[in-house]
Amino acid sequence: MSIKKLQILSLLSLSLAAPMMVTPMSAAQDPVDNDPYQWLEDVTGDKAIEWVKERNAKAESSLTTSDEFKKLESDLLAILDSDARIPFVSKHGEFYYNFWRDKKNIKGLWRRTTLEEFKKPAPQWEVILDLDKLSAEENESWVWKGASFLRPDYDRVLIDISRGGADATVTREFEISTKSFVKGGFERPEAKGSLSWIDRDHVFVQTDFGPGSMTDSGYARIVKRWKRGTPLAAAEVIYEGEQTDMLVAAFHDDSPGFERNYVQRNVKFYNDELFVLDENSKLVKIDAPNTASKSVSRGTLAIELREDWNRGDKVYKAGSLLFTKLDDFLVGKETIEVVFEPSPTTALASFGFTKDYAILNVLEDVKNKVTVLRATPQGWKSEPMVGAPAFGTVSVSPVDPDESNDYFMTVTDYLTPTTLSMGTIGQAPQKLKELPAFFDAKGLKISQHFATSQDGTRVPYFMVAKESLSLDGNNPTLLYGYGGFEISLQPSYNATVGRAWTTQGGVYVVANIRGGGEYGPSWHQAALKDKRHRAYEDFAAVAKDLFARKVTSPTKLGIQGGSNGGLLVGNMATLYPDLFQAVVCQVPLLDMKRYNKLLAGASWMAEYGNPDIPAEWSFIKTFSPYHNVVENRKYPNVLFTTSTRDDRVHPGHARKMMAKMEAQGHSVLYYENIEGGHGGAANNKQSAFMQAIAYSFLKKQLFGKESQ
């Protein structure tokens, strides 16, 4: 088991001879303290819900009544419900577990099978828990959130479920053999938090214990040890963080021979302390930088640096991955090995451990290269990953790191159906499963390009288009981006994009802008706080490059993003309105004056800054769309979507922006799903509907009709 970091998308004339030179519109003046739409933050208030229903009805009338919409929704649902999807599994004991939703099982089945059976084209599954049945019995809309097993017997699990897909969960102890919840077992009431096994009769619990027990970010401030048979109120306090911390948590590493307890204190999003909790409940801090990501696997401490680290007479470079023996490190006898050091074009995408090896997955210009490290008495030695493909987005994960050197490998790109293979390090993997072609990719191609941002930075982007694309500036184009929280956007097979967009004549573009993790920590840090504008300049640069290459033009360009990507496209609409015709803004942040007071918003101040500090608000206000939208400017047509049950990014952001733009007379539509959490949908049917609405809107705006 690894202790992992805690941590989730108009110009009227155009010169075709040269790139566009477009200057972003300036930010609006400081907002007045009185917010006339703050009442829309009352998530389930009668007045607010009535307002939502009225906007939903308008969006439905505009976007969902045609035969084309109904066919698209049906096609997307068929993809999402398809039995031909890959049932990805995780190994626990001798069984391989999977959670599955389809047309019949809307809320889903938690099920298992054997490896021998899983290798068959149509495996037989043993159902362990039926979420539809449970929801019906309890008159709740339960959404699966995961399960953790008690080792080494694997007979008990702690199951997390949530109402409507919210981040707040309920945890219940479950008996595998009887396929039932344990009467009188461990059970945690609904809150943002968790239970984690220590042993059969003890768990760590971090949850809402009452007033003062949660951080400003809305997560647990206190972690306790809870003994079976005692009330939750009697649990022993292990650690208390500060009110201003992001969260605290405790974990038990149950790897045989390496058993230890750990406490993690996340001071901020990119700042945490990791402690060893000894048998006397004493905390021993692991003396690695707070800004580094720290994890432990089978006695090896891995340190992933976000900043340069001066230690002794050495300087370890930001973006590097370091390995050392934890026991030695704790007593100052460590020998630190640099197992990866970045170059200007490379970054560590991920790493993991099998029993005897480490697997490194490196991005080079947003393309994967996988290598293996073998533990030897002389240190970690690099070897090629046998069977790793030269092209495609590659993901490799250990099957059971305490027992074997087996791994799962997935390979995908925008046009090639995803494959799942299994192998042992040193041997070529065997393909187990492959998606069918959910859309006809014949005549389509993937290409990578680089735009030049305002400060000269090269910004990569991927484009999916017809091989015979006419470079006349008249192609309906959808540009997607995120640009935050170290998230890298890599090519992957997206059947809904293929079915709804690229096979219909649309061009699909994904921008790898700063703020993401495509080039490591420096790429992310280049767009933090007062440098946030660089992410938006990068996105604008990609749009201008598409114009310069005559792929599209402002009246044919739409953009889409969700969450932080919703903030991105909200800013592109308000700061660069002449570049775009249509905007799909999903589960967004938009009111950056109050974001830190809404739900989990305080946890993101390391990314955006603190609006309560005047010096920081002075730059935050420049990328707060809610405060920068004005009446006398022409903006792109916008569709806002969100979820009532989103308890991470408050639906008030989208609600208030919609209300303000609507009152100012701009062309806006709004749809709010009553369930769904931050993902926007609680089941496949809702997901198909929400995606169909977005594509229906984009087609109307960019094709001039719902389908070509």
Range-by-range predicted roles:
Residues 50-149, 160, 247-266, 270-306, ...:
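Non-catalytic accessory segments flanking enzyme active sites
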Residues 124-146, 156-161, 166-202, 206-213:
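Asp-box/WD-like beta-propeller blade repeats and closely related beta-sheet repeat scaffolds
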Residues 132-153, 160-168, 180, 185, ...:
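Cap/lid segment of the alpha/beta-hydrolase catalytic domain
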Residues 220-266:
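Polar, glycine-rich mid-to-C-terminal structural blocks
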Residues 497, 503, 510-708:
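Active-site-proximal cap/loop segments of hydrolase catalytic domains
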